[in-house]
């Protein structure tokens, strides 16, 4: 959820999305969802001569699984806050994993196996 929250803070900013098929699209971030699907408006394709069919497109929806990179303006990225939140999320994940492991161990110790000969 870290990146989802981070991208939500960038709504309204201009970003460049590079797709796995080498298409790069620049536009204003309109919305992003938990799957990191992205909606851009007022888009511009970086290599219009290579993708002439994209010239007339003004808005687009990009499925998160086809994104290779997202280029962000440096002034909009607060590295310290991002590092703090990633550490916090890692700690919470570690805590959840430990609790899950303890529950699994308790369940396995409570079950007994009987064999008949």
Curated annotation (Swiss-Prot):
Any one Gene Ontology cellular component term annotated for this protein = nucleolus
Q: Which UniProt keywords apply?
A: mRNA processing, mRNA splicing, Nucleus, Ribonucleoprotein, RNA-binding, Spliceosome
The UniProt entry's GO biological process terms, in alphabetical order, are:
mRNA splicing, via spliceosome
Segment Disordered: which positions? 83-117
- List the signal peptide residues: none
The record's listing under InterPro entries reads: LSM_dom_sf, Sm, Sm_dom_euk/arc, U6_snRNA_Lsm2
| Source taxon at top rank | Eukaryota
Q: Name one GO molecular function term.
A: RNA binding
UniProt-recorded name of the protein = Probable U6 snRNA-associated Sm-like protein LSm2
Q: What is the lineage of its organism?
A: Eukaryota, Amoebozoa, Evosea, Eumycetozoa, Dictyostelia
């Amino acid at each position: 959820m870290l990146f989802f929250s981070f991208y939500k803070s960038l709504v309204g900013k201009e970003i460049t999305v590079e797709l796995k098929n080498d298409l790069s699209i620049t536009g204003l971030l309109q919305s992003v969802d938990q799957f990191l699907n992205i909606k851009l408006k007022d888009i511009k394709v970086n290599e219009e001569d290579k993708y002439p069919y994209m010239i007339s497109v003004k808005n687009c929806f990009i499925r998160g699984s086809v994104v290779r990179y997202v280029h962000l303006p440096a002034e909009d990225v607060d590295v310290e806050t991002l590092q703090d939140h990633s550490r916090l999320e890692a700690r919470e994940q570690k805590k959840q994993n430990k609790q899950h492991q303890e529950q699994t161990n308790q369940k396995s110790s409570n079950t007994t196996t009987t064999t008949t000969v």
